[in-house]
Amino acid sequence: MRTSLIPGRQVRVQLLGLLVLVAAPLAAADEPQLIAPVAQQVIQRQGFDPRVAPLNDPEGDSRGWADVALIWTSPANATAGWQSRTVLLENAYGTAVDWTELTVSAADGKLHSSLRIPAGGWYRLELRHQAGTQTTKSLSVEPVGVGEVFLISGQSYAGGYNDEKLKVTEPERRVTAFHWREDRWIVCDDPVPHVGPEGTVWPALGDLLVPMLRTPVGFVNVSVGATSTSSWATDGPLFADMVTAGKKTGSFRAVLWQQGESDVIEGTSATEYDARLKVIRCTAMKTWGLDVPWLPAKSTLHPTVYHKPKEEEAIRSAIEELWSTPGFRPGPDTDALDGENRGGPMTMRHFSGIGQRRAALLWFVSIWTDLHRPAADDTKDK
């Protein structure tokens, strides 16, 4: 076979190619990388005072804020000279933060800092390194928001076992879900990862909340179909998953608990249900290091599966009792949704599409009412 390559030159060319292949990942490794926050992430705000109308406090901080953790890598691991800011994206709520000098620490090969960001979004978060007046490195992520985050737990009515796959209709898509097994945030379109193949109520709830709260909304859903309170025992795998998801989220406004049908089937007494849920909440709160309310829904009807008025009433009375128990607050009574709100035998046999939207409305009323509860009521949770 004829070749036009001189042997010595061929070796040099091969070595040059090898060096290029090796150098490419090395060059990429030399580039700074932003680890947190991530795109679509919603960080729970603090300092929100709904009793102060924003129009009466235009320059105040009654809408709240978050000290957003910044984590990134940079080859030199230099801690001096870093700045960060936020930029309002189109139609965003909130207030932009101008370039701010960061106090940076280094640990485990990463750089760590934080930036106080007012409630709102979407934002683009930017990070840069300055040497005098020269920008030597720059990073950014979008969209990110500071708003309201809710952890969802329970069984199939909370998960993806309802008739219609709902999509977020909020124009800027400011309703997201934490894919906690993969540590990423996504738009909260059904089906949501891990919780069933079909529809939920949560996209519709987010659509209702965002324009009223004027912040993005995030959901973390750990519900599992066909589970009773005994399935969520604190020494079991479902509780462990819930704890993991909560730890990864960091902070959230409340736990939305939609569950009860399997306890109706098992014949759980009101006393047992009450005691179990108190233990589940108490243990979770201690593990998370948080003290947030749980809003249990009255969720006992399952018309295509059973008709057990006595057992249903036992669970309803337990939830009624929990609503007045410190650490718990009233969720919705979704048992009010019967008839056309439930799918028939040839469907998913949970909420129909209209039922999903009405359940979302009931959840909205509960959350909105809770956010605006009198300040004096907060002492009742202690």
Model-identified regions with their sequence ranges:
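N-terminal secretory signal peptides that target proteins for export/translocation
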Residues: M1-V11
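Exposed, low-complexity/repetitive linear segments and helix-based recognition motifs
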Residues: V11, A27-A28
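Bacterial N-terminal signal peptides
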Residues: Q14-A24
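Cell-envelope and extracellular/periplasmic
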Residues: D30-K382
